[in-house]
């Protein structure tokens, strides 16, 4: 019967001969390109060249970026140093301005302190009312001195000290048997420090050392030199 007849198997060679493609079976070996195959080497070589070129390009870009980083870092360091110096200079200028304003203000107050000092030394209040008024002035003076002390103002102690032009202003000089030369023997106006710096120089009287033995003159020894021509003149007259 035609329906039950099985189709005979076709020979692969016959199939190829008839122009049909052979059917691959799972057991057929897979052809792989050989490393020694010139065709495969030709396919790999361009890819390797592209990778090397890309690597060289990346290395150049890395070098360029590293150089730019070094330049920018140097600029940043200079800008940071300049800003730090500017900040320090501004802070120093502000401190100097503050000190100048403080010194200017305190210099206007010091004459008031001088007046209190003179009043305390000269006044001799008599009677209960005068003494009460004197105590009131002394209380004001003490408050003023305390405020100055809180601001960093301190009086100089100059009597008996060696004369120092950076601290003292010599108003008078006189001979003194009790003090050697260039020693302060009297304070004429008190000097003050402000936080260790001179706020006002002290006006002082300075010793010139012991005077002449006969006490006839307080001038240095220029006077005997003035008498020398007179002695020469007298001897000349005697010879004549």
Curated annotation (Swiss-Prot):
GO terms for cellular component: cytoplasm. Belongs to the GrpE family. Residues 215-233 have a biased composition (Low complexity). The gene is grpE. Residues 1-54, 206-240 are annotated as: Disordered. GO terms for molecular function: adenyl-nucleotide exchange factor activity; protein homodimerization activity; protein-folding chaperone binding; unfolded protein binding. Participates actively in the response to hyperosmotic and heat shock by preventing the aggregation of stress-denatured proteins, in association with DnaK and GrpE. It is the nucleotide exchange factor for DnaK and may function as a thermosensor. Unfolded proteins bind initially to DnaJ; upon interaction with the DnaJ-bound protein, DnaK hydrolyzes its bound ATP, resulting in the formation of a stable complex. GrpE releases ADP from DnaK; ATP binding to DnaK triggers the release of the substrate protein, thus completing the reaction cycle. This is Protein GrpE. Gene3D superfamilies: 3.90.20.20, Head domain of nucleotide exchange factor GrpE. It is found in: Cytoplasm. Homodimer. The keyword Cytoplasm applies. CDD domains: GrpE (cd00446). It comes from the Bacteria. Keywords: Chaperone, Cytoplasm, Stress response. It holds the Pfam family GrpE. One of its GO terms (biological process) is protein folding.
């Amino acid at each position: 019967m035609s329906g039950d007849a099985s189709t005979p198997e076709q020979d692969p060679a016959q199939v190829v001969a008839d122009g049909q493609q052979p059917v691959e079976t799972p057991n057929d070996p897979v052809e792989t390109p050989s490393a020694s195959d010139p065709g495969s080497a030709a396919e790999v070589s361009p890819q390797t060249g592209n990778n090397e070129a890309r690597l060289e390009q990346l290395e150049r870009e890395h070098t360029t970026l590293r150089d730019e980083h070094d330049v920018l870092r140097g600029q940043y360091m200079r800008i940071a140093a300049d800003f730090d110096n500017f900040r320090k200079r501004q802070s120093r200028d502000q401190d100097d301005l503050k000190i100048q304003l403080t010194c200017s203000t305190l210099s206007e107050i010091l004459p008031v302190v001088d007046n209190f000092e003179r009043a305390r030394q000269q006044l001799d209040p008599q009677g209960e009312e005068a003494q009460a008024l004197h105590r009131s002035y002394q209380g004001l003076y003490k408050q003023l001195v305390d405020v100055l002390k809180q601001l960093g103002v301190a009086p100089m102690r100059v009597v008996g000290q060696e004369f120092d032009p950076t601290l003292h202003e010599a108003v008078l000089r006189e001979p003194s048997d009790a003090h050697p030369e260039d020693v302060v023997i009297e304070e004429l106006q008190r000097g003050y420090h402000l936080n260790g710096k001179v706020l006002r120089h002290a006006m002082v009287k300075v010793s010139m050392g012991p005077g002449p033995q006969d006490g006839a003159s307080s001038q240095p020894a220029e006077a005997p030199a003035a008498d020398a021509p007179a002695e020469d003149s007298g001897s000349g007259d005697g010879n004549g």
